[in-house]
Amino acid sequence: MAKNIFLALACALTLPLIGCVTTNNTQIANTEPFVIDSETYQATGKSERIKSIVLHYTVSDNARSIKTLTTGNVSAHYLILDNNDNKIYNLVPESERAWHAGNGGFAGRTILNDTSIGIEIVNAGIKPEYRDALKNGALDYHPYEHYVEFDELQIKKVAQLVQDLAKRYSISAKNIIGHADMAPSRKIDPGAKFPWQRLYKEYGIGAWYNEFDKQFFMNQDAFAAATIPEIKQAFRDYGYQINDTDVWDKASRNVVYAFQLHFRPQQPTGELDLETYAILKALNKKYAGRDDFY
């Protein structure tokens, strides 16, 4: 009796602060409906979650690409087939994470699945007769002619989609990349025949260097004087992940090859030559925000 009187008194004393009920001698706070107010106060410290667009090819035909991307552990936000319809297929809502990027990074960001939109384009990648070309060791990398062309309608679909995404999410030009750019140790897509330069010139999509700047940096003496660590730092300045060894080992050459696939696709060799160096310097002058070029 005394215990119940004490509990009732405790509830009465605390009632101004919380509602009080008793169930089996247990004190419980009443729950009330609360309103989420998202208008009265607004924070300025915020940005879009989507920071980049990653372009892929599927290395498969339409049917297999659809099956792989809708039933397996790999997915993408968008799929562009190689047929003649007028559709771009949205497989994963943009608000959700698709499993398309995997391990790698670009522009200081890793786990790009969390911060990117993935676009898969149906394309075989390497022509069937060249798929085993690297196995005998005669070649380290596939040259331009080994890659499969993209369909014209596919490129127009890519252009429309990427323009829209880049505008809606305020994605910077240099963060519109290929899978190879963020994972050069294991990926080469969308390959040498993806028309990065055309997309830049005709649709204003992605990054490209100024020819005048490239010619300025085509200086053999400056190239010869540049150390390997300095050149690797230039790759990092643009956004590529590359090791800090003082040799052009296979991992480093993979980065060079990925860079060439994007910015010098007609001659992707994996070798750091004068033209590749000049293009890298020109890109950094234009996009990396550095002011020590002249």
Segments (PLM) and residue ranges:
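Acidic, His- and aromatic-enriched active-site or binding-groove loops in soluble protein domains
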Residues: 45, 79-80, 192-219
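Second-shell loop/turn segments in exported
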Residues: 41, 66, 105-106, 141-153, ...
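C-terminal motif of bacterial Sec signal peptides marking the signal peptidase cleavage site
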Residues: 16-19
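Acidic/histidine-rich, metal-coordinating catalytic segments
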Residues: 171-186
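Active-site-adjacent loop/helix surface patches within enzyme catalytic domains
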Residues: 25-174
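Short acidic, glycine/serine/threonine-rich helix-capping segments at coil-helix boundaries
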Residues: 221-283, 290-293
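Bacterial N-terminal signal peptides that target proteins for export
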Residues: 1-9
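Bacterial signal peptide processing site
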Residues: 21-23
